[in-house]
């Protein structure tokens, strides 16, 4: 006869054999494969034997399907403007990645450059790229996984060419190339709140080659990137000083939910040091971003103004809008 005490003992044994499988957010070690749960969409399958590429495909496909359904409902509402649909869809997609571990340099691979798709681990740039690639797919009705891969390639590389030197390492180049492709435009105005001007002096990569393993042993790539740095240097861009960021009608009418925030920097040789996605709360402008501080994708609890005051080298923000 199976007694009650026997059943309790077996239950305890099974629980002991199944430890908690929650994701880790440690930055120093490679993050374990995880599954983003984009509620209310069905979560990606938790198959421990699945390859990372299969998990990435499952995550992206799940987010695309959920976002496609969300967008169709938005389009049925005649009271929602085209601009509001864009903002709402971008935020909807961006929030699907909340909690995803922050891992730097996931695009750096051994050997030849390839199109890296990693939805399990994100840095600030890959977070924005993945969000915007999915946005472009859904808003244009091209929602297959192959459509997504193609869109990501076009966003990430100059002329869509998968090569290390063609990857848009400087965000100013990313803006420029994707403006040419018709995906984005940068807000540039001589009037407030764009009251400051950034003069570019770009040379960080070629003066810090040792920081880039895929670059240091490639003289041709160094030469190509040095040429691109020279082309970017000397350009001037309007930006909003961090001390000027406010929660008022001017800022709310200028910066929209879903805009890309590019944080300008005083660090020598760089144009920007961090990027994220704008989101307004009652207390002011906040930022969705893959955070090195929080070690995951977060909707920053501090306002952007408060956040930037804690980073002395951050000077202000440039604003880029998806089309």
Model-identified regions with their sequence ranges:
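C-terminal soluble interaction/assembly domains
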Residues: 253-323
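Cationic-aromatic interfacial patches
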Residues: 51-131
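Sec-dependent N-terminal signal peptides
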Residues: 5-13
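N-terminal secretory signal peptides that target proteins for export/translocation
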Residues: 1-2
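C-terminal motif of bacterial Sec signal peptides marking the signal peptidase cleavage site
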Residues: 16-17
């Amino acid at each position: 006869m199976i007694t009650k005490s026997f059943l309790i003992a077996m239950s305890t044994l099974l629980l002991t054999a199944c430890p908690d499988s929650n994701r880790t957010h440690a930055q120093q070690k490679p993050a374990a494969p995880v599954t983003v749960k984009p509620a209310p969409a069905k979560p990606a399958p938790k198959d421990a034997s699945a390859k990372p590429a299969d998990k990435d495909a499952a995550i992206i496909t799940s987010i695309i399907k959920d976002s496609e359904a969300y967008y169709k409902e938005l389009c049925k509402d005649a009271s929602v403007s085209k601009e509001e649909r864009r903002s709402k869809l971008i935020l909807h997609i961006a929030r699907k990645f909340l909690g995803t571990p922050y891992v730097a340099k996931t695009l750096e691979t051994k050997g030849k450059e390839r199109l890296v798709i990693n939805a399990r681990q994100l840095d600030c740039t890959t977070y924005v790229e993945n969000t915007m690639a999915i946005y472009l797919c859904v808003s244009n009705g091209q929602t297959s996984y192959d459509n997504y891969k193609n869109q990501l390639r076009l966003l990430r590389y100059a002329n869509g060419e998968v090569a290390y030197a063609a990857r848009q390492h400087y965000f100013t180049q990313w803006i420029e190339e994707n403006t040419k492709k018709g995906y984005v435009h940068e807000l540039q105005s001589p009037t407030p709140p764009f009251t400051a001007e950034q003069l570019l002096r770009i040379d960080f990569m070629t003066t810090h080659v040792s920081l880039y393993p895929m670059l240091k042993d490639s003289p041709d790539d160094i030469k190509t990137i040095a040429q691109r740095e020279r082309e970017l240097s000397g350009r001037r861009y309007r930006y909003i000083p961090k001390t000027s960021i406010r929660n008022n009608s001017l800022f709310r009418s200028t910066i929209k939910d879903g805009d890309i925030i590019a944080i300008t920097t005083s660090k020598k040789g760089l144009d920007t040091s961090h990027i994220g996605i704008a989101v307004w709360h009652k207390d002011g402008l906040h930022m969705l971003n893959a955070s090195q501080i929080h070690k995951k994708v977060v909707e920053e609890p501090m306002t952007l103004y408060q956040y930037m005051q804690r980073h002395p080298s951050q000077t202000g923000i440039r604003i880029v809008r998806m089309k």
